[in-house]
Amino acid sequence: MKRNILYLLSIGICLFTCVGSHAAAPETRAHLERGRSLFDHGRWTDARYELLKAREGADRDDRLTLQQIDYQLAVCALKLGSRDAEAMLADFSKRYPESVYNNDLRFAQGLLYCSRSEYDKALACFGRVNYRALDRTRREQYDLRMGYIEFGRDDYDRAMTYFDRINPQSEFYDHALYYKSYIAYAREQYDWARSGFERLLKSEAYGEVAPYYLLQIEFKQGNY
């Protein structure tokens, strides 16, 4: 009888412990869902707060969820320009060497270096990116940044190979067209340059600068 009582008590304690250990799960899930939603909407500061809360309550054995949280925290750090962003990337790569997220993180780090005008570092990052594994939008961003880096190095041929890959329907096309038109202008390919700058007259980004180049082309061709 005594043995049965002890057995029932042990079950009760076990159940109480299990219930207590899972009591925070709904709150953790709520933090995680809010964090992911904020992340998807580019609200990096708020997303980081929610994701940190989610990580505190996450099951340490749930490696997949931890990996996803750590990936999103690393992206938040990159987007916010945090001082520890590079350390977080290194830690992520060490902790999850086979993660599918490593390629996206290298790409995001390259974008960060571009925003800081640290183009040699950006080039090194992009050189380790698997281009084919990127989605369509990231590929276009990659091509635009790589084209700009090569343009800045005066390697117009290589720059053109990147700019030419950007689809005319892309949100980044006007940027690519501007540099392609400028390269044509610099090479005295004025007919091609004129065609490009005329298309940019309606561009929100380049509509004001395009007339200057069109006027210069007319002058260089003696049309004055």
What spans do the regions from the language model cover?
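Acidic, polar-rich low-complexity tracts and alpha-helical solenoid repeat scaffolds
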Residues: 2-7, 18-224
